[in-house]
UniProtKB/Swiss-Prot annotation:
Family, as annotated: Belongs to the tetraspanin (TM4SF) family.
Identification of the protein by name: Tetraspanin-12
Domain of life: Eukaryota
Stretches of the chain found on the membrane's Extracellular side: 34-59, 111-224
GO CC annotations, alphabetized: plasma membrane
Topology class, membrane: Multi-pass membrane protein
Subunit comment: Component of a complex, at least composed of TSPAN12, FZD4 and norrin (NDP). Interacts (when palmitoylated) with ADAM10. Interacts with MMP14/MT1-MMP.
Species of origin: Rattus norvegicus (Rat)
PTMs per UniProt: Palmitoylated; required for interaction with ADAM10. The precise position of palmitoylated residues is unclear and occurs either on Cys-9, Cys-12 and/or Cys-83.
Functional description taken from the UniProt entry: Regulator of cell surface receptor signal transduction. Plays a central role in retinal vascularization by regulating norrin (NDP) signal transduction. Acts in concert with norrin (NDP) to promote FZD4 multimerization and subsequent activation of FZD4, leading to promote accumulation of beta-catenin (CTNNB1) and stimulate LEF/TCF-mediated transcriptional programs.
Transmembrane regions: 13-33, 60-80, 90-110, 225-245
Subcellular location: Cell membrane
Major localization class: membrane
Amino acid sequence: MAREDSVKCLRCLLYALNLLFWLMSISVLAVSAWMRDYLNNVLTLTAETRVEEAVILTYFPVVHPVMIAVCCFLIIVGMLGYCGTVKRNLLLLAWYFGTLLVIFCVELACGVWTYEQEVMVPVQWSDMVTLKARMTNYGLPRYRWLTHAWNYFQREFKCCGVVYFTDWLEMTEMDWPPDSCCVREFPGCSKQAHQEDLSDLYQEGCGKKMYSFLRGTKQLQVLRFLGISIGVTQILAMILTITLLWALYYDRREPGTDQMLSLKNDASQHLSCHSVELLKPSLSRIFEHTSMANSFNTHFEMEEL
């Protein structure tokens, strides 16, 4: 009875962990999709520079392909683990454990690789100044994608230019910065701010923002936290799966052992009862012979007297 209660408890815990797998995997996919616009625009602005290489090394190899593949696979694995737990299927549970172990090793290797790449990122602040060369094509019809990338980055990161908003006046033929540099954006806001109040423009350059982006954004920190949480949950799930496998395997062997023991006990009891039944006639005959011998001896002694 106690073993059955333990099995129920283990199954409930595995249900909860599989639910966590689904929730965390969906969260990772959502955050990765959220980061896609950031990464696409950053790569557009940093094309053919050392900054682009740093962005690719920091984000793309692990954050997008590997994490997305692992999370999609975890959703499927969680479903099979749930089915194995419901049906108490030893084969499904063993496959579930092995798959979790392989995924955990892949995640661990990716984490180590990412840490080494972050240490090796060769970007310095001086490299950010080279981004000014990408400003000269802003607003040209054939470079609409670059114009969109600059506007998106300046709006999202609340910055203007590379070092300062005057970079737009130095590197282009514009008389004032783009409207995306305005704190409160509306058509013609940049011209109005440039003529009346410069405080209505973002004062910080985008170079520092991009450098901070390479050091790690909130989205990247969230992904790292989710990755660590998934790893810890996988360890717990593997421990519980091994325990459940042992309990189910023991339960399947235990009834046979009990049956054999009961058969042996029944056989021994039957043999003992049968032996007693067989011994009863013999004992009665011995008692009769003993009585007859005693009576004969008594009769013989009386004749001698």
